Curated annotation (Swiss-Prot):
InterPro entries: DUF402, FomD-like_sf, Ntdp-like, SA1684. Belongs to the Ntdp family. Its cofactor is Mg(2+). Mg(2+) 2 binds at residues 106, 108, 121, 124. The lineage of its organism: Bacteria, Bacillati, Bacillota, Bacilli, Bacillales. Mg(2+) 1 binds at residues 88, 104, 108. This is Nucleoside triphosphate/diphosphate phosphatase. Its EC number is 3.6.1.15, 3.6.1.6. The active site is at 24 (proton donor). Signal peptide: none annotated. The keyword Metal-binding applies.
Length: 177
C-alpha cells in the first residue's frame, strides 16, 4: 500500500467530522502531485454528496491543496472574475487507498481575487466544539493554523502564490485532452 496516490490517478475526497461521521464526499478528483506530505488535485463539475444524501455538482474548475503537516486544506476555484480560495481548517490528510480523508473543523477562510478574506463559521465551530468535545489542544492547533493561513495569504505563500493555481490548472488541462 502506497502512502499516497499516484499522479494521474482519479481519487475520491472524504471529509469527516470530529465525531467520525462522514461530512461530504467529492466523487472524482485527479491527482496532479502526490507525495507522502502533499497532494495537489483538481476537479471540475464533480459530484459532491452531503452527509444527508443530497448531491450537487461543483460549478468551476478547482485546484485542491492538502498537506500532511498543516491543519488546513486550500481549494482554489477558477472563476471568470479571478481566483477565489476556500480554506478549510481541518486535520492533516490521510490516504488509505479508498480515498484522501480529513476531519473538517468547521472554521473556513474565504479569500477573494484581491486577496481580501473573511473568517467564516465561527459560531458553528464553537457549537461543534462543545457538542463533540474538541480537546483544548485541537482548539489551540486550529487557532494557530488560522493565524498561519492568514500569514500565507498576506505573504502570497503556497497556493496563494501568484502563479500557483495557473500552473496546476495547466497541468490539469493536459489530462483532459
Amino acid at each position: 500500500m502506497s502512502g499516497y496516490p499516484a499522479e494521474g490517478e482519479i481519487i475520491q475526497i472524504h471529509s469527516y467530522k470530529h465525531n467520525g461521521l462522514i461530512h461530504r464526499v467529492w466523487e472524482e478528483s485527479i491527482v496532479l502531485k502526490g507525495t507522502s506530505t502533499c497532494i495537489i488535485g483538481a476537479n471540475d463539475k464533480t459530484m459532491v454528496t452531503e452527509a444527508d444524501g443530497r448531491t450537487w455538482v461543483t460549478r468551476e474548475p478547482a485546484i485542491c491543496f492538502f498537506h500532511a503537516k498543516h491543519w488546513f486544506n486550500i481549494i482554489g476555484m477558477i472563476r471568470e472574475e479571478g481566483i477565489y480560495y476556500y480554506c478549510n481548517l481541518s486535520s492533516p490528510f490521510v490516504w488509505d487507498e479508498e480515498a484522501l480523508k480529513y476531519i473538517d473543523y468547521d472554521l473556513d477562510i474565504k479569500v477573494f481575487p484581491d486577496m481580501t478574506y473573511i473568517l467564516l463559521d465561527e459560531d458553528e465551530y464553537e457549537r461543534h466544539r462543545k457538542e463533540m468535545n474538541y480537546p483544548d489542544v485541537i482548539d489551540r492547533i486550529l487557532k494557530n493554523n488560522v493565524k498561519k493561513l492568514i500569514s500565507w495569504i498576506h505573504e502570497r505563500k503556497g497556493p496563494f502564490a501568484p502563479d500557483f493555481i495557473d500552473k496546476w490548472y495547466e497541468k490539469f488541462l493536459s489530462y483532459r485532452k
